[in-house]
């Protein structure tokens, strides 16, 4: 089997991850080529069709039409920049990540601890997505979704709302017509490639 790694269309922090994938594939006896349309399995970075990754969309669409597998590499959801996702045919819930029956060894290795369900908190957090991501396919414009969510929350709750836009899909000032809605602009953490201060302090629930 031949893996084609599309590093030309990866984010600036992706090269070491592509290299690690290539090393692992070769150690298992597979062939690896770079940016070659003739591979058996394409390996791309993210399903955000924007910026450097925009040209991955043609690879993704072609593979869907041909029932050809696509491995998606992406920054990890836990300890970003330290852990990384490797999914088959998507990311998050759309992807296959291998066997599900895992024990707690990996969580222990990452010093993760499951906390009790939060029943307190002041704010309802609405977390925006990037509307050019494959995750947002067949959905309304992000601005419409956010406004609809604010109206829906305010119809059922008097809790104040925090709107936290995606760092690269900021939707300036769309919440101004509403009372009791606060914009929280993510700030990049010093020394990181794309980590932001996305904490959940005093959050009652999150809508995303």
Language-model-detected regions and their locations in the chain:
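Short, aromatic/basic amphipathic alpha-helical patches
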Residues: 16-25, 54-64, 173-180
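A donor-sugar binding/catalytic signature common to diverse glycosyltransferases
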Residues: 188-208
């Amino acid at each position: 089997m031949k893996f084609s790694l599309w590093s030309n269309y990866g984010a600036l922090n992706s090269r070491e991850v592509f290299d690690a994938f290539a090393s692992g594939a070769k150690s298992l006896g597979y062939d690896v080529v770079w940016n070659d349309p003739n591979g058996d399995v394409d390996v791309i970075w993210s399903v955000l069709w924007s910026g450097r990754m925009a040209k991955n969309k043609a690879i993704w669409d072609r593979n869907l039409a041909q029932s050809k597998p696509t491995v998606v590499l992406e920054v990890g959801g836990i300890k970003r920049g330290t852990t990384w996702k490797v999914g088959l045919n998507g990311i998050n819930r759309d992807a296959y990540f291998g066997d599900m029956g895992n024990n707690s060894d990996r969580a222990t290795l990452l010093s993760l601890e499951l906390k009790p369900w939060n029943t307190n908190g002041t704010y309802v957090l609405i977390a925006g997505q990037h509307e050019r991501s494959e995750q947002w396919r067949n959905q309304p414009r992000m601005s419409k979704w956010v406004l609809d969510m604010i109206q829906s929350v305010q119809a059922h709750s008097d809790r104040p709302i925090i709107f936290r836009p995606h760092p690269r899909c900021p939707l300036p000032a769309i919440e101004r017509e509403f009372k009791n809605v606060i914009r929280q602009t993510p700030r990049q953490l010093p020394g990181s490639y794309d980590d932001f201060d996305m904490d959940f302090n005093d959050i009652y629930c999150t809508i995303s």
